[in-house]
Amino acid sequence: MTAPAVEAARAVDWADFAPLHPLAGSDWQVWGVGLLRNAGFPVSGLDLIGGTSAPAAAARLAAGEGTAEEFDTAYRADVDAEAARLAALATDPKLRLAIAWQNRTVFRILDSLAAPGGKETKRRQRERTLAMYWLRYCAKAETIGFFGPGAWIGVGRTQEAIGIDHGPALVAAARTSLERWTVAAIADWMAEQPGARWWFPPMLRPDVHLDGEQLVLANRKTVRLRPEDAQVLRLADGDRNAEQITDLLIADHGWDAAGARGAVDKVLNRLLRQRVLGWDANIPVDVRAEEVLRRRVSAIGDPEMFVRYDAVLAELARHKGEIDRAGSAEQLVEALDALDAYFVETTGQAASREEGKAYAGRTLVYQDTLRDCRMELGRDFLDGIARPLALVADAADWFGNRLAELVETEVVALVRKAAARQRPGTAVTLADVWPQTLALFWGEHNHPVQQAVRELALKWREVIGEVPDGATRVDLSVDQIIDSAKKVFATGEVRSPHLAVHSPDLQVVARSVDAVNGGQHLVVLGELHACLATLDLPFLDWTADTGSLRDKVNRAIGGERLVPLLPVGWKRNSGRMVPAPIGAGDRLIGFTRAPFDQRERIEPAVAITLTEHDGTITATTTDGRTRTLSELLAVLISIIACDAFKIGLDRPHAPRVTLDDLVLFRETWRLPATGVALAPKADRMRDYLTVRRWVADNALPDRAFVKFPEETKPSLVDFTSPTLVLSFANLVRRAVQSDPDARVTVSEPLPAPEESWLPDADGEQYVSELRLQISRKVPE
């Protein structure tokens, strides 16, 4: 059953959301609040996928010890057994509920899988789809719905490594929300109805600067304004509707009440034709979308229109209530379908979008949940990884500084070129170099981040030292490499306070909580997100006491940021997920059309001046505040640095690298896709034999995480499973067809399923991950 949307349990003290606890023997501090992420289904579910007879039969055949008939028999037996398990799985109520939330198209094939018969090729395809969903739900620690509930944890407050208490259920609290694009579509429909736009907010474009009684456009052209135009624009803040603007002009600026409404309408339409103004629902791309729409409707002064639109909001709320009350997958699908039908009937738009894209917010609603547990990560745990984690954090500081330095060098050159084109005495603005600056991060040519990554790889190679060919494990101690690491990763002060927070994702290799507390465990550094506070998760703001998580980060760091106001179509900019959450004190860089409901917080790029003195560029905003280039571009640098920072050895086969009790890098293979040597035409049994031979030749584990070039994240593949080997073979063929030089990245599954320590109240164990934040100090 979907849990009701309730207030989150106070499991942590939010006053501890700051760097509080020293990593022993270093000047790094761990923040006092972390996040436990986990799978929503027990890890034991992985045992439902896989072959028992075919792998051995394939090995015997490859060694010349078995026959094709023996393999054929074993393979068909495994296919039938796995198909039977998948058919039974298709009836599992909890799995059906998870899939109903995520993909109703897949949900609708589950009954046909559970029933016998049907066309074999279609049935096998559906089995592959279900198997891939199941492995994801059992093997990946996520933060989405009840199939990935998170839990806030206390960090460093207790001595024992891990203390955990469970409630009776997996999920303690849930919240269902409309996707931002859903809200925007409803709001746009409202604003487009006859006579409605008057009750919605006009806003001066983010990339246009109002300077007295003239506008400065992004291309530096100026538009002289009539006095009344300037007065209207100063009030067009993206939140006031035209009626509210009119009232202020009458009350504060002496406009004649009799003709003010017509005059304001005339001004707004004139500015709209000049394309310096937006006049629509203006729903920002963040988790406040529903709140903003409610505010829009509440401000409508036309009684008939207000009642009509208020009824729409009430109907949306009713549909959300039905979704929350759904007690089964079938009831959930019925409720979701009803919401879809209402949305289509109301807006005339499709009820889904961006099919197949990750982080896109494809359907109308989403649900976030909290796990029903309370957990403390104690000092014994932190002390065990303090020295190696501090060494990695030193490397992250170096990487952030080096990336910022490379970006600054490029931007200085851009500013100088722009200055040479200007008339004497004319300052360069950020708008003059903004397109080229963005290209430094996401353009087609050689980016600064690519150079920084290459240099980082060389530095890790120098620190780790020579690794013999064929080695599968490299075990190092901090004492062995600390002098080299301090020299190699030496760097100055971090160039911006907002590049000074690093976020490790840790996985614990242990069979139980008792094993962890007894010191019988290993810790894996899954990733370290450099220069980024990854606990800044807007979709969990509802769980975090008062205020947003971004506000808490800014308070702890002691400063606000300049955040680029990204347009709606920007990658991963869906509302629930955003590249750069915006805090209450942050100011925004306006560089294109983009919705936001507080125009006074936007700094148009054309109004930010860039001046050079003694080789240093200083950015000055309209309030007179100055910033270095790294401070100006800190958010962009952070977005890129967080995924670019890597540890390990760039070689076809890289061994597992362990530093004291912290695994820095899992054993990894980067293999040419053509090396699988599949025949051009698919054949299930032949493909299985070919893949099993490839696994054996490269000494790969039977279960491994696999990533193809076009994929965002790796997926678990069981190379004993007839179902998943067939999927893998299809992906290999597709990759080779797209790029003959494509490589497949394979990494060991660490922790192994039996080493998943996180239990529930029933004793089942779950894949999990601990997300922490560390910083050297609170920057001044």
Residue map of PLM features:
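Type-3 copper protein
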Residues: M1-A169, G262-E560, P759-E780
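Acidic, low-complexity/disordered tracts enriched in E/D and polar residues
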Residues: L130-L235
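Accessory beta->alpha helical hairpin/"wing" motif in late/C-terminal subdomains of nucleic-acid enzymes
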Residues: L178-Q214, N269, L277-P303, R625-T626
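Hydrophobic residues embedded in beta-strands of well-ordered beta-sheets
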Residues: L215, P284, G615-A619
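Short amphipathic beta-strand/extended segments with alternating polar/hydrophobic composition
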Residues: A218-P227, A420, P424-V433, T626-V635
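Short capping segments at the starts of secondary-structure elements
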Residues: R234-Q244, L248, G254-W255, L406
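C-terminal structured domains
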Residues: V508-P779
